[in-house]
Regions:
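Iron-sulfur cluster-binding electron-transfer modules in prokaryotic oxidoreductases
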Residues: 2-160
Length: 160
């Protein structure tokens, strides 16, 4: 993860961001709210260049290497930037995290993907894959979230 120190010791976190197809079509507002929230909470989402659909479903066949390549491209770009990869779409998170695990642990898949992509430096699962909510929980923290709330819902009945 790429951390830079801001004024008064506050950390500025920068993540590679994989929005996914759904956040570009049906969930544009969710994407906009996540980006705005990230700014308020002191971290930046730097969108992966030329990302492609992850496929939405993890391919179980080990011979289906082509279906994993878009995820490997995104993971490799994050690695080259020295950043963790964040996504907000749960399907993308699942697919990319599983492909990353394959690249880390399954030699045949790793070799075939790297041979196909002809990367300068082979990718071997070095990137940390996070869901946006994991960043909020584990990196930003609940105390910071509470501090940044503008309109608290105290006294409101929610889902009752």
């Amino acid at each position: 993860m790429n951390l830079r120190v801001k004024e008064k010791g506050q950390q500025d976190m920068k993540y590679s961001y994989y929005p996914g197809c759904t956040l570009r079509t049906k969930a544009k507002d969710l994407d906009a709210y996540a980006r705005a929230s990230a700014k308020v909470l002191g971290f930046e989402l730097e969108e992966i260049e030329n990302w492609q659909c992850c496929g939405g479903v993890y391919p179980l066949g080990t011979d289906e290497i082509a279906t994993k390549l878009s995820s490997v491209r995104a993971l490799n770009e994050a690695k080259e930037k020295g950043q963790d990869l964040v996504t907000l779409c749960s399907a993308c998170h699942h697919v990319i995290k599983r492909v990353n695990d394959d690249m880390k642990n399954v030699e045949d898949i790793r070799t075939r993907a790297n041979n196909y992509m002809q990367l300068e430096e082979p990718y071997a699962g070095e990137t940390t894959v996070l869901h946006f909510l994991e960043v909020l929980r584990d990196r930003v923290g609940f105390d910071t979230l509470k501090e940044k709330v503008v309109n608290p819902l105290k006294g409101k009945k929610i889902g009752a």
